């Protein structure tokens, strides 16, 4: 009986010791994530984006530049293959499709968590409100939407040196979009005009949830 008890205690100790490094790694990744949202005031760089289906076939590739400034101000300029601008002034979100000469505008609060721009440009509180966070590997954060109304079913964020470098988003059709960030500069001064948007003259402007104005 004593031998069995000693073995059980030893096994429990071994299991607890094996779990401790994992918990430490999870805590470190969570701390890195919190520092990004709490301490990094701005981030800018270039990006590439690739979408492929569940079989791995590439459906779309794009690239461009981005600027993020807290709280909730950002601009993503897609240069290829179809020019597009996604701009937030902290209150409203503008999406301008140049080839369609069309602008869609909505409240930023209604858009949080719906795409890379709002995921990376928001706050940690907004992120935790929209997603359940887990930490499957060092430097990786898995985000599970709390509501089925969001555009993606699974999101995986990869951190490197305390900032996001890759975002993987899977939708309900099994399509996966991978966004990679490069040439990153953090805590730099960004021209406030980057986060302003004026619809081009003659563009079709659509108020999401409302009517259409010309």
UniProtKB/Swiss-Prot annotation:
Statement: the UniProt record of this protein carries the keyword Chaperone: yes
Main location (coarse class): periplasm
Compartments where found: Periplasm
Cellular component GO terms, alphabetical: periplasmic space
Highest rank taxon of the organism: Bacteria
Family under the similarity heading: Belongs to the LolA family.
Oligomer and partners: Monomer.
Name the record gives this protein: Outer-membrane lipoprotein carrier protein
Lineage of source species: Bacteria, Pseudomonadati, Pseudomonadota, Gammaproteobacteria, Chromatiales
Gene: lolA
